[in-house]
A protein has these predicted regions:
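Short, charged low-complexity linear segments at domain edges
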Residues: 1-3, 27-47, 272-282, 304-308, ...
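C-terminal amphipathic alpha-helical segment
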Residues: 242-278
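Cofactor-cradling patches in redox/metallo enzymes
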Residues: 142-232, 263-280, 285-369
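Short cysteine clusters
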Residues: 11-17, 21, 56-62, 66, ...
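Short, surface-exposed amphipathic charged segments that create phosphate/polyanion-binding patches used
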Residues: 240-254, 300-306, 368
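Hydrophobic scaffolds flanking metal-cofactor catalytic centers in soluble metalloenzymes
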Residues: 8-16, 22-40, 50, 148-151, ...
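Iron-sulfur-cluster electron-transfer modules
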Residues: 5-8, 25, 35-211, 216-223
């Protein structure tokens, strides 16, 4: 990227980016200063930690708030790429990248275990040359993390209940590389983008449904060769509910609220579909957080932050948990595996297990059938 591409010269140093940045108050990251520093060649000799590069969650709140179209989050990714090229990265980030290269996922798990989440489900494995309505892209976190696997299994239950023709890639499914790109590993992203595009297209799907907003965003916006419609799973569920193919049999009797994942909400404007599912389940017991939709507070899970220790006191996910409890909710729903993990951890670190449960929307809907 260039200064011109990022519209950096349009910056008027108004500070709206830093004022909206969810982590700037507790870390060295300051989007306004970073743009100024970059434009005036003042970043030379400063470390990534001094610049706060690893603190950015790439939530793009800074970009959304900029009145001149400057994209500070993209500048962070560009500057990170220089750090990655030099080899100056944390052990955690290096491990995630090496695991992606060797095993096709950033979690250090063997490729042969990628389908363990689906044990006993007898899922159709799509082969090259075949055809299907929906190719379900499970994503690395839902495939490997024990907390997120139930959400993937619940989604399978829902698709079957609705009579959807679908299949999965199986053990060959490989990381979408969305987070690797945001970390700054552009070369790895391009390689996986091309191989994943081929892997998906040769299986003949009419559409791709992603369980993760990060995979959804990558396929929709960063995979130009993917010539079939891409959906997040909540969009498909809303479609099935509206068509009457999914009919909840039991209403949720608890107060439910919803955390908008950044990569689903403010970056792709998918706000209504998740709420349609929750309103079908909870009716007027569904309540909105004060910071929701375009102004939703980031949980700190994106932009490679799953492999970076959080700086400063307190975590944004803990704020989200407290806000939910103050609202009177006993269930905080979301639609992203990273959000599920950060929020679940925040429930524990705030000693709120008896007050609040974190649930994926697919889990809630499957429980109602």
């Amino acid at each position: 990227m260039s200064i011109e591409t990022l519209e950096l010269k349009s910056c008027i140093q108004c500070g709206r980016c830093s004022g909206g940045c969810p982590v700037s108050m507790k870390s060295s990251l300051n989007p306004r200063k970073l743009v100024y520093c970059y434009l005036n060649d003042l970043c030379q000799g400063m470390s990534a930690d001094e610049l706060g590069l690893w603190e950015c969650t790439t939530c793009t709140t800074c970009t959304e708030r900029c009145p001149k179209g400057v994209r500070p989050a993209d500048l962070v990714v560009e500057m990170r790429s220089k750090v990655i090229e030099s080899g100056r990265m944390t052990t955690q980030i290096r491990g995630a990248l090496e695991s992606t290269y060797l095993q096709g996922n950033p979690w250090g798990r063997g490729r042969e275990k990628r389908m363990d989440w689906a044990e006993g489900l007898d899922l159709p494995i799509l082969k090259p040359g075949g055809k299907t309505d929906v190719l379900l892209f499970v994503c690395c976190t839902n495939a490997y993390d024990p907390r997120c696997q139930p959400a993937a299994r619940a989604l399978v239950q829902l698709l079957r209940a609705a009579g959807v023709e679908f299949g999965v890639i199986g053990e060959e499914e490989t990381c979408c590389s969305s987070e690797q790109r945001r970390i700054g590993e552009q070369g790895m992203f391009e390689e996986l983008r091309d191989s994943n595009t081929k892997l998906i297209m040769e299986r003949g799907p009419k559409r791709v449904v992603a369980t993760s907003p990060h995979s959804f965003n990558a396929f929709k916006n960063d995979y130009p060769g993917l010539s079939v419609p891409v959906m997040h799973y909540t969009q498909l569920l809303a479609e099935l509910l509206e068509a009457g193919k999914l009919k909840p049999k039991r209403q949720i009797e608890e107060v439910v609220t919803y955390h908008d994942p950044c990569y689903l909400g403010k970056q792709n404007m998918v706000f209504e579909e998740p709420r349609q599912a929750l309103q079908a389940l909870a009716g007027d017991r569904f309540v909105e957080l004060d910071r929701s939709r375009e102004t939703s507070l980031c949980c700190e899970g994106g932009g490679g932050r799953m492999w970076v220790d959080s700086a400063g006191k307190g975590r944004l996910a803990e704020v989200r948990v407290r806000d939910s409890i103050d609202l009177g909710a006993t269930i905080l729903a979301t639609a992203c595996p990273y959000c599920t993990l950060t929020l679940e951890d925040a429930v524990k670190t705030t000693d709120s297990e008896a007050k609040l449960r974190i649930k994926d929307i697919a889990e809630l809907l499957a429980e109602s059938l």
